């Protein structure tokens, strides 16, 4: 028997019961049987509309599968509304794995040739482009690389009478001869086409941006690393979607509103969300901190990466040990060539140790204060605080003062220079970067012993009843809080010891300090000690009866028995420490999974609540019914994208500019 639609099954049931009811009634059957059939008919009608009614067993298929009836077809994520009306599958799209390519501009996306061959852009034939379209068709459907440049082919020609003609190598000449004005040529993807690029989950508007195409060999989409944060992408196997825009208006709209450079600054916090990351930061920091000297050859090599054309940095000369003249360029001068004219900034660098005063940071031996005067870097190292996303003051200033185009050009240049210098200089990190001298290890062991001794003293006071409870806390809570404080201090002290012995000549420390990757806490856990493991903000207390593991005595409240890890990752954890560490890690994983589903549902509710709000012509925020929600957008009328970290005006910059103009005027 042919498999029928579930609704057909239900309708068959309804008709069958109706017939039986009529036959029984006409035959004068007993009241009981008629009522039974009457109820059965009600059951079939109910399940025809909704097969998940509470208190009613669902109607099932012969195989035992519950039937999918009218209500189930409309409801929920897989239902008609959300699955087929709000969201549809589309043509002219591609999906594949993503890879990094630091040589592309942030505006570009590398598209595999296979994708470019399949995806097409409609070109309407006019008298002006008639010859161009003829040439396209004559090439046939196979794209070519001529003199290193990609040349697209044509897949279809749509005649004015709406007939589609597939272009092949055999019929290309014939189709070209019969080409008329008004036809549409479906051209394959070409360099410079505007496409939309998206990564799911699409959580904010920067998860879908417009890029220009660069057709490349290979089978993955390529894009530049600064674009990772808005998409929240990494290259461990993520896939992304590409949509080819078909209309001319849509293309213009995407280019003006959605292009990557138009979204460098985020409406979430009024700062750049696209910025230099990882290698770019460590490269530029090493290029500018303490102003190193680069040989003229090396400087030329680095600048050639960005196709530099402009005022070359100042060239200096010095005699080397053999008395030969050596020509060199200062790193800061090289960096200054990337800056647009007229920049004056002064701020702390990210590498500055916490607690260091500005006066100390400005000392040449420290060099942790960035000073840019008239677009010349005078002091400090360029790090996370200058060019990274979210925190990058210099990048933010360029985007604000000179516009998105200038910010994009600066970002493209600064990332290439950072990579170029790092490649030239060499930069390696290994497990040996976490090695501490014996003196440091002894100091850390002494601190661990002191902590354990202090915890034992607290336990003795608790058992004797000498421990004073904190206001509003029980004795047990007070003990736990005091022990947590002691173990926390132990980890901090070990971190300080590790930091004292690991200097900026250590690659891992340099990465952490300049903000390229990792933190000093990560390093202190690798080299010093891991510290107290916590579950739900408390020491680990669950496990066996009166103890956490069978390796401890009953009622043991000491540091090790409750999850204090005194070892470092480098030295390795013993089995009990490893177990406690896994408990802490497991909590993190569960927390992440729970948070994701909660926030997803919350965002959905928020979107549904706010989807009909817009700023009306009179500047008020209204819904479709015309109800006023706000008299001025955001109560202050400030566009968060153009704000300065949420503030409407950057007063410090204005004061500094006025002071400078006063000095120049001699007043």
Could you tell me what each predicted segment is?
Residues 13, 323-424, 539-586:
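Function-dense linear segments that define catalytic or interfacial modules
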Residues 1-264, 331, 335, 368, ...:
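Core mixed alpha/beta domains of very large multi-subunit molecular machines
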Residues 80-81, 121, 133, 140, ...:
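Intrinsically disordered, low-complexity regulatory segments
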Residues 2-5, 89, 273-277, 401-411, ...:
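Structural motif
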Residues 7-13, 237, 410-420, 600-615:
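Hydrophobic/aromatic-rich, well-ordered segments within soluble, folded domains that form packed cores
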């Amino acid at each position: 028997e042919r498999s029928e639609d579930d609704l057909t099954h239900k309708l068959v049931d309804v008709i069958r019961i109706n017939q039986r009811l009529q036959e029984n009634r006409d035959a004068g059957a007993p009241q009981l049987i008629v009522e039974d059939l009457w109820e059965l008919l009600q059951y079939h009608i109910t399940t025809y509309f909704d097969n998940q009614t509470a208190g009613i067993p669902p109607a099932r298929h012969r195989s035992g599968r519950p039937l999918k009836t009218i209500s189930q077809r409309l409801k929920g994520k897989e239902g008609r509304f959300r699955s087929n009306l709000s969201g549809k599958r589309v043509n002219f799209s591609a999906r594949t794995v993503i890879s990094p390519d630091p040589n592309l501009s942030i505006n570009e996306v590398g598209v595999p040739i296979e994708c470019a061959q399949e995806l097409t852009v409609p070109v309407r034939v006019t008298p002006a482009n008639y010859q161009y379209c003829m040439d396209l068709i004559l090439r046939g459907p196979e794209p070519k690389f001529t003199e290193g440049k990609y040349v697209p082919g044509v897949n279809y020609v749509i005649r004015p009478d709406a007939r589609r003609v597939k272009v092949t190598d055999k019929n290309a000449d014939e189709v070209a001869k019969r080409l008329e004005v008004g036809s549409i040529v479906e051209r394959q993807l070409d360099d410079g086409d505007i496409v939309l690029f998206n990564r799911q989950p699409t959580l904010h508007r920067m998860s879908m941006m417009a890029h220009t195409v660069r057709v490349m060999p290979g089978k993955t989409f390529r894009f530049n690393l600064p674009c990772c944060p808005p998409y929240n992408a990494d290259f461990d196997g993520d896939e992304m979607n590409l949509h080819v825009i078909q209309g001319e208006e849509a293309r213009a709209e995407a280019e003006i509103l959605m292009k990557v450079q138009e979204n460098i600054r985020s409406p979430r916090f009024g700062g750049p969300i696209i910025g230099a990351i990882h290698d770019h930061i460590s490269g530029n920091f090493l290029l500018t901190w303490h102003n190193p000297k680069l040989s003229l050859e090396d400087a030329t090599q680095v600048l050639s990466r960005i196709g530099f054309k402009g005022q070359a940095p100042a060239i200096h000369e010095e005699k080397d040990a053999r008395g030969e003249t050596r020509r060199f360029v200062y790193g800061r001068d090289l960096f200054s060539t990337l800056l647009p004219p007229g920049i004056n900034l002064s701020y702390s660098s990210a590498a500055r140790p916490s607690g260091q005063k500005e006066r100390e940071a400005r000392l040449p031996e420290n060099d942790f204060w960035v000073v840019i005067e008239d677009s010349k870097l005078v002091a400090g190292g360029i790090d996370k605080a200058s060019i990274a996303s979210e925190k990058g003051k210099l990048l933010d200033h360029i985007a604000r003062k000179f516009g998105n185009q200038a910010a994009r050009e600066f970002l493209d240049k600064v990332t290439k220079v950072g990579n170029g210098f790092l490649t030239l200089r060499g930069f390696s990190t290994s497990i040996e970067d976490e090695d501490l001298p014996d003196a440091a290890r002894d100091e850390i062991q002494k601190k661990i012993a002191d902590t354990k001794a202090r915890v034992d003293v607290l336990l003795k006071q608790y058992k004797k009843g000498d421990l004073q409870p904190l206001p509003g806390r029980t004795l047990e809570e007070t003990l736990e809080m005091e022990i947590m404080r002691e173990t926390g201090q132990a980890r901090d002290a070990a971190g300080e010891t590790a930091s004292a012995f690991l200097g900026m000549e250590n690659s891992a420390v340099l990465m952490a300090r300049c903000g390229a990757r990792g933190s000093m806490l990560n390093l202190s856990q690798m080299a010093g000690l891991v510290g107290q493991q916590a579950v739900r903000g408390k020491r680990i207390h669950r496990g066996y009866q009166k103890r956490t593991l069978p390796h401890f005595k009953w009622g043991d409240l000491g540091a090790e028995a409750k999850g204090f890890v005194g070892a470092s990752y480098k030295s390795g954890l013993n089995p009990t420490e490893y177990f406690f560490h896994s408990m802490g890690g497991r909590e993190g994983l569960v927390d992440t999974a729970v948070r994701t589903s909660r926030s997803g549902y919350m965002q959905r509710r928020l979107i549904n609540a706010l989807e009909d709000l817009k700023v009306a012509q009179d500047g008020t925020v209204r819904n479709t019914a015309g109800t006023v929600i706000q008299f001025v957008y955001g109560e202050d009328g400030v566009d968060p994208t153009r704000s300065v970290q949420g503030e409407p005006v950057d007063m410090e910059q204005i004061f500094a500019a006025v002071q400078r103009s006063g000095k120049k005027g001699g007043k």
